[in-house]
Design a protein with these regions (language model features):
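Positively charged n-region of N-terminal signal peptides that target proteins for export
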Residues: 1-7
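Generic secretory/membrane-interface signal
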Residues: 7-8, 17, 41
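C-terminal segment of classical bacterial N-terminal signal peptides
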Residues: 14-24
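Sequence context of c-type cytochrome heme-c attachment sites
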Residues: 24-130, 146-157
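Domain-level detector of nuclease and nuclease-like folds
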Residues: 135, 139-144
Length: 157
């Protein structure tokens, strides 16, 4: 009898702490904000990115081709040509998350909310990029003639 009472009393308490733990862990994850949020502190880099980086307006190409693509093909486009597609808080649709519709700053540098919350600390954002980072989308099979150095070192921002 005692054991049943203890189990009945402990179950709601245990569930409460589990919910709090899950919510706290989820809140600790950085979320996507969109490139305009980056521009507030990184205006010069943002302006260069918008002017020189082809991916800064990648949603236009997807919208033009969308009617000729299957849902699967469209999702494949989203994985590289939008920000955070398929990840928590990432791009969902042009209507629901328009601020993430292009391949923006956070595609390379990661979700920016913690970076902003911590006052711009470099420990909460990817500041040094490597060719491996680019290869997530720019693999040989996807882009035969991709030249990493001009984008990585040549003023994409």
């Amino acid at each position: 009898m005692r054991m049943r009472f203890f189990a009945a009393a402990a179950c709601p308490v245990f569930l409460f702490f589990m919910v709090v733990a899950v919510k706290t862990a989820h809140a600790a994850e950085a979320t996507y904000m969109g490139s305009k949020a980056c521009a507030e502190c990184h205006e010069e880099q943002y302006d260069k990115f918008k002017k020189y980086a082809k991916k800064a307006n990648s949603s236009h190409s997807i919208k033009v081709m969308a009617s000729d693509l299957t849902e699967g093909e469209l999702k494949e486009c989203f994985s590289c040509h939008t920000t955070g597609y398929g990840r928590p808080g990432g791009f969902k649709s042009f209507e629901e998350t328009p601020e993430l519709a292009d391949a923006g700053c956070e595609v390379c540098h990661g979700p920016g909310s913690k970076h902003v919350d911590e006052g711009g600390g470099v420990q909460s954002i990817k500041s040094r990029l490597s060719i491996k980072d680019c290869e997530a989308c720019h693999s040989e099979e996807r882009v035969d003639a991709f030249n990493f150095k001009p984008m990585l070192f040549g003023g994409a921002h």
